[in-house]
């Protein structure tokens, strides 16, 4: 070996043995297959593949982790790191601070003293006395504090002896936890877990507390069971001071082409009534393949007072007939421009009775088969067939079988500015009854054939106009609709499902005046109507619509249900207005005027002012001569700072009675909300129920109390949660 080569070798060995000093950056590799470590600092000392000591503005990167501190000691052979002074560990799922850190970079095991932490992907943060790193995405905090409030805000927090954070499952688990609001303990839980993401997880949900006039103080503790990605269950023990312990159970499922929900609430022994009480709701729908679809909707309660005593949902408590129904349907194309549908239906109702005013329950349908076919543009004609076969059953009224068929053909003549559509059909009905429908007749097999003719026509005229600085299209749409149906005697036919339809602008253009199939009205009448729409030229949105119309009769009406014979030459006068009267102001109004005496028969008015989310005022008035007169008022409106007020009233002027009322307040802080709502409503059995909702919502953690959101949504059209904005 030459002298020069020997000198090079000696110099290389000396460089390896010399400590590293005054180096700004160094890339190092630990043992095995570990990721490279990059260190930046004011000063770095150490030996290659042994111990590295960095001081001053230290920044150490390994993979997706970054460690910052005043002083770092790194052992390359074991990948242990020791950090002193202002330790900051940044990772994809969280950021950790502390005064002293010991950890292994490969196993993520170690400890952090005097820790503070912030969870990414959410607002969770906190502190503790000691943080134990227990592997990738896992750590445990001793004497922990947790909150979702921002820095320097301690309105609410959890104090726990032990808090586990699982960043992989996005779940926190606290032991011996005290929830504090404004530094006051409000709830102690020996064990609790919570999610700091929107993903579903198994565990106890926040307790629900409230008070009702019928059940007293209520406390519920829901348990959510995430059984599988496509089905879950919520089991809720509900303790009522006056009635005992009720178990509310909800099961939901969804699959390919199917889905459903089962709600079963069970009170084994009501302390007030000394009876077993329950409520059941089951909904299921499913595509069966090859054009078939099935659905089931079953509702039942144990007794007539169930909703009044145990319900807190306005929609349910106002129900009289609880639907119990199963359907199966088939859909298929019928060649080109055609559709064939077949369906079967089983239907009955549980009638919730008011002992002071009992009603007759509806007929059972056991079963009904329907077959409908539509074929369009056959040599310019549209063919239609509607048919049904139904078995009606009732414990006290005459019942039996009914067959109906209504074939029709229409000739649609249309172009860009108007249309003419004549149609002719024959409605046939046949009965097979267990007993004659009325005393004095022996016919148990009556039938009826009624031809029906109609002619619908209309024109659409347009013009451009400028209004309020905007460009609009105004339409003028006159429409004429003529119907001829000869009179057929029907007083001796049963009436299973026919009722007179509400008179409205849309009903002016219908051939039939009755729903169902048992009554076919006679008609020789013409409808004259005019509509005008205001359409925004750029967007195509309809800004305003005004419609007016009247049906003129050329002969007296003879087919009636309960009303006296109508001999007037014309129907009542109908006018409707809907759309935006001004910015943020919407209206929907209608009036029905008696043409003979110019008396108002019906009024429907509604106006809404909604300048921004969380700001809405609604007002409505409804009037039907000799039937009802009601006023509806509701609002959601902010006042002061962070406060909102709620109010709603449905009042009967005819009976001088409050039908439903609501009053509430909400305070929205940056990380919590407090809601107080009182509601009172009349049930289907004409009895009143009063509920008080108090709820404290700790953002991204839990809700304590009874949730009034559903009641607010039902009572105030346009209500939105401003804490989610």
Curated annotation (Swiss-Prot):
Gene Ontology cellular component annotations, sorted alphabetically: cell outer membrane; transporter complex
Record's subcellular location: Cell outer membrane
**Kinase keyword on record:** no
Main localization (coarse) = membrane
* InterPro entries for this protein: LipoPS_assembly_LptD (IPR020889), LptD (IPR050218), LptD_C (IPR007543), OstA-like_N (IPR005653)
Q: Which GO terms describe its biological process?
A: Gram-negative-bacterium-type cell outer membrane assembly; lipopolysaccharide transport
- Highest rank taxon of the organism: Bacteria
Keywords assigned by UniProt? Answer: Cell outer membrane, Membrane, Signal
Listed disulfide bonds for this chain?
Answer: none
The signal sequence is 1-25
Q: Any idea what job this protein has? A: Together with LptE, is involved in the assembly of lipopolysaccharide (LPS) at the surface of the outer membrane.
Give the quaternary structure: Component of the lipopolysaccharide transport and assembly complex. Interacts with LptE and LptA.
The entry's family comment says: Belongs to the LptD family.
Spell out the protein name for this chain: LPS-assembly protein LptD
Q: What is the lineage of its organism?
A: Bacteria, Pseudomonadati, Pseudomonadota, Betaproteobacteria, Nitrosomonadales
């Amino acid at each position: 070996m030459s002298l020069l080569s020997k000198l090079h070798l000696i110099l290389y060995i000396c460089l390896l043995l010399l400590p590293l000093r005054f180096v700004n950056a160094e890339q190092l590799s630990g043992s095995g297959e570990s990721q490279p470590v990059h260190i930046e600092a004011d000063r770095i000392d150490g030996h290659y593949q042994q111990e590295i000591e960095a001081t001053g503005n230290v920044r150490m990167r390994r993979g997706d982790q970054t460690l910052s501190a005043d002083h770092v000691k790194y052992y390359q052979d074991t990948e242990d790191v020791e950090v002193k002074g202002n330790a900051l560990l940044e990772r994809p799922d969280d950021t950790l601070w502390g005064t002293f850190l010991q950890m292994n970079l490969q196993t993520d095991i170690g400890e952090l003293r005097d820790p503070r932490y912030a969870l990414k992907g959410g607002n969770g943060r906190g502190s503790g006395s000691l943080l134990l790193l227990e592997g990738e995405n896992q750590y445990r905090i001793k004497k922990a504090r947790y909150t979702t409030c921002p820095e320097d805000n301690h309105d609410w927090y959890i104090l726990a002896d032990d808090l586990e954070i699982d960043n992989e499952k996005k779940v926190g688990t606290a032991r011996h936890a005290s929830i504090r609001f404004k530094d006051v303990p409000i709830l102690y839980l020996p064990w609790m877990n919570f999610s700091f993401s929107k993903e579903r997880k198994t565990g106890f949900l926040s307790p629900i507390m409230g008070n009702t006039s019928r059940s007293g103080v209520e406390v519920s503790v829901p348990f959510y069971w995430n059984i599988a990605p496509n089905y879950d269950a919520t089991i809720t023990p509900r303790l009522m001071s006056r009635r005992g312990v009720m178990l509310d159970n909800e099961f939901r499922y969804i699959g390919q082409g199917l889905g459903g929900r089962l709600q079963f609430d069970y009170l084994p022994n009501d302390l007030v009534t000394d009876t077993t009480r329950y409520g059941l709701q089951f909904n299921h729908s499913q595509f069966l393949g090859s054009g078939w679809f099935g659905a089931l909707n079953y509702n039942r309660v144990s007794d007539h007072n169930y909703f009044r005593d145990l319900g807190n949902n306005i929609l349910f408590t106002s129900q009289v007939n609880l639907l119990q129904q199963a359907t199966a349907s088939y859909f298929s194309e019928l060649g080109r421009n055609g559709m064939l549908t077949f369906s079967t239906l089983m239907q009955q109702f549980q009638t919730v009775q008011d002992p002071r005013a009992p009603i007759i329950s509806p007929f059972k349908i056991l079963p009904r088969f329907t077959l409908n076919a539509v074929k369009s543009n056959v040599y310019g004609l549209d063919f239609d067939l509607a048919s049904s076969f139904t078995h009606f059953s009732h414990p006290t009224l005459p019942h039996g079988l009914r067959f109906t068929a209504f074939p029709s053909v229409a000739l649609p003549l249309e172009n860009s500015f108007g249309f003419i559509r004549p149609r002719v059909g024959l409605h046939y009905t046949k009965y097979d009854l267990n007993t004659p429908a009325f005393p004095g007749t022996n016919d148990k097999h009556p039938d009826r054939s009624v031809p029906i003719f109609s002619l619908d026509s209309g024109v659409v005229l347009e013009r451009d106009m400028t209004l309020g600085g905007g460009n609009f299209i105004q339409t003028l749409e006159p429409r004429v609709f003529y119907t001829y149906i000869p009179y057929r005697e029907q007083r001796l036919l049963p009436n299973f499902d026919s009722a007179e339809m509400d008179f409205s602008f849309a009903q002016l253009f219908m051939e039939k005046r009755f729903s169902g199939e048992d009554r076919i009205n006679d008609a020789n009448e013409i409808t004259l109507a005019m509509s005008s729409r205001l359409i925004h030229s750029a967007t195509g949105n309809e800004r305003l619509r005004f419609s007016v119309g009247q049906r003129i009769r050329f002969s007296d009406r003879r087919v009636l249900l309960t009303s006296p014979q109508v001999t007037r030459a014309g129907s009542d006068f109908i006018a409707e207005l809907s759309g935006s009267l001004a910015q943020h102001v919407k209206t929907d109004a209608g009036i029905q005027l008696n043409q003979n005496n110019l008396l108002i028969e019906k009024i429907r008015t509604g106006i809404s002012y909604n300048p921004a989310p969380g700001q809405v005022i609604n007002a409505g008035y409804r009037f039907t001569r000799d039937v009802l007169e009601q006023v509806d008022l509701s609002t959601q409106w902010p006042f002061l700072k962070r406060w909102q007020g709620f109010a709603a009233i449905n009042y009967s002027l005819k009976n001088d009675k409050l039908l439903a009322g609501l009053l509430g307040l909400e305070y929205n802080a940056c990380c919590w909300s407090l809601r107080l709502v009182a509601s009172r409503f009349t049930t289907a059995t004409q009895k009143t129920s009063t509920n008080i909702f108090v709820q404290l919502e700790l953002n991204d953690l839990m809700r304590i109390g009874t949730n009034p959101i559903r009641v607010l949504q039902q009572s105030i059209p346009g209500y939105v949660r401003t804490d989610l904005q």
